[in-house]
Amino acid sequence: MIYVDNRQNKVEASEKLIERLTEVIEFALKEEEVNMKCEISLLFVDNNEIKEINNETRGINRETDVLSFPMLEYEDKKVFKDMYKDYKFSQSDFDGDELVLGDIVLSLEKALEQSKEFNHSYEREASYLVVHSVLHLLGYDHMEDDDKIIMRSREEDILNKLNIIRG
């Protein structure tokens, strides 16, 4: 289940956008071989709120586009399908019958700004940021160059399969 909470009023969070981002999340989970019911919270905020959250949680006092808060722990260079595909989780990892994967905090204001900067649609930018964040929830990272190459490849593969293209 994808729980959406819109806590901003600077950029419209239309039903169409919410449906598309929900579809993107569900497809990314399927592509990453997550074979169980999952819970992800998707929180829409503005630039001021994401700056506050970024400062509180990461000690970085500036706005960003998206933040990811995974609930599962991953070994270095391991992702969900490597560690948890056939794992027997404890009941504390679940909310009811759904595995809690974590939270995505997305600045719709920043997504709109970046869509203009990169000259593609708002839907494409928001979708990219959500895929990026889902991959973080599943253990992907981009701090090292080799990890970044893998993560970017997965992002583009998922978006291309959904026909969400640049431009």
Swiss-Prot record:
The keyword Hydrolase is assigned to this record: yes
Cofactor needs: Zn(2+)
Example of a GO biological process term: rRNA processing
A single Gene Ontology CC term: cytoplasm
UniProt remark on cofactor binding: Binds 1 zinc ion.
EC number: 3.1.-.-
Keywords: Cytoplasm, Endonuclease, Hydrolase, Metal-binding, Nuclease, Ribosome biogenesis, rRNA processing, Zinc
Tagged with keyword Transmembrane helix: no
NCBIfam families, per database record: rRNA maturation RNase YbeY
HAMAP family: Endoribonucl_YbeY
Family as reported in the entry's similarity comment: Belongs to the endoribonuclease YbeY family.
PANTHER family named among the record's database cross-references: ENDORIBONUCLEASE YBEY, CHLOROPLASTIC (PTHR46986:SF1)
Role summary: Single strand-specific metallo-endoribonuclease involved in late-stage 70S ribosome quality control and in maturation of the 3' terminus of the 16S rRNA.
Protein name, as recorded: Endoribonuclease YbeY
Species of provenance: Clostridium beijerinckii (strain ATCC 51743 / NCIMB 8052) (Clostridium acetobutylicum)
